[in-house]
């Protein structure tokens, strides 16, 4: 849906700002979940050029809103001056590396499927950015239906991180699960759906991390299908689940299990 990621926009803001004013970053914070597109990101920094910062923020906000017209056009860059303070700041070299990282770390769709029209094959999202006493940490979620593509993208982020002197840790990896052209289970589920609702279901391949991949990896040749209720604004802070749809899915699943028992 061409949603903007606040962590990536922060990299753009800080990179552009250094051309307008001197500043020293105290801390960065954005996002709570690595698989949710970050809606807010905050930076604290010291500067003597408050007016220049305000002017630049307004200019960049206007540019970004224009770029995201129709998809995420209410983006806001808010500047608050807190007065004179004394604080620890990042070393200039560390600050430069972090801005470089945010500007260059991959985000969004990296490759579309070559076999299924309109399906995203590989994507990534930098969903968390936070500062502790002696480090700045970024966390990205990588998804792909092709394991080698997933690993290649992971390597790219690792290389960027390590090149800048950081450490990269890979965790929570789940297996890719490729679309199966012939699926008796899927055929049975379509049959049950038609019997219940008098119409064909819309069977699609989606770009998501699912438990099916874990079972598929452990059980060679497993035929599996994922189903679920209607959801909107998935992987954003506005994500919602339809309760009435959940009830329908439950009743449908019961019927599918009964049909498989026959």
Language-model features and meaning:
Residues 35-42, 88-93, 178-191, 214-218:
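Short glycine/threonine-rich loop-to-helix capping motif typified by GTGT followed
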Residues 2-5, 49, 90, 114, ...:
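Catalytic cores of large soluble enzymes that bind and process phosphate-bearing ligands
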Residues 3-20, 49, 94-103, 111, ...:
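His/Asp/Glu-rich mid-to-C-terminal helical/loop segments that flank catalytic regions of hydrolases
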Residues 19-22, 164, 220-223:
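Short coil/turn connectors at secondary-structure junctions
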Residues 167-175, 184-203, 251, 258-262:
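C-terminal non-catalytic regions of proteins with extracellular/luminal or membrane-system context
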Residues 1-143:
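Midchain, well-structured core segments that form catalytic/ion-binding scaffolds
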Residues 131-188:
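C-terminal structural cap/anchor segments
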Residues 114, 121-137, 141, 190-255:
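Zn-dependent metallopeptidase/amidohydrolase metal-coordination segment
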């Amino acid at each position: 849906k061409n949603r903007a990621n606040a962590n990536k926009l922060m990299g753009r803001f800080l990179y552009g700002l250094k051309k307008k004013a001197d500043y020293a970053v105290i801390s960065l914070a954005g996002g709570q979940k690595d698989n949710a597109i970050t809606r807010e990101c905050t930076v604290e920094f010291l500067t003597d050029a408050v007016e220049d910062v305000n002017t630049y923020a307004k200019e960049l906000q206007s540019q970004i809103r224009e770029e995201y017209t129709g998809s995420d056009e209410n983006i806001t860059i808010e500047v608050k001056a807190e007065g004179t303070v004394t604080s620890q700041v990042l070393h200039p070299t560390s600050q430069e590396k972090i801005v470089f990282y945010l500007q260059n770390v991959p985000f969004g769709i990296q490759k579309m499927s070559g076999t299924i029209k309109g399906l995203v094959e590989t994507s990534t999202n930098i969903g968390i950015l936070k500062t502790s006493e002696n480090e700045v940490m970024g966390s990205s979620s990588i998804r792909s239906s092709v394991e080698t593509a997933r690993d290649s993208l992971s390597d790219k982020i690792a290389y960027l991180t390590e090149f800048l002197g950081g450490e990269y840790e890979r965790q929570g990896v789940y297996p890719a699960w490729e679309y199966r052209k012939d699926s008796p289970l899927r055929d049975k589920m379509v049959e049950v759906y038609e019997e219940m609702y008098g119409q064909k279901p819309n069977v699609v391949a989606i770009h998501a991390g699912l438990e099916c991949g874990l079972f598929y990896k452990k059980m060679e040749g497993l035929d599996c299908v994922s189903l679920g209720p209607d959801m909107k604004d998935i992987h954003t802070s506005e994500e919602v689940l339809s309760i009435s749809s959940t009830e329908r899915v439950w009743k449908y699943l019961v019927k599918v299990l009964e049909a498989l028992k026959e």
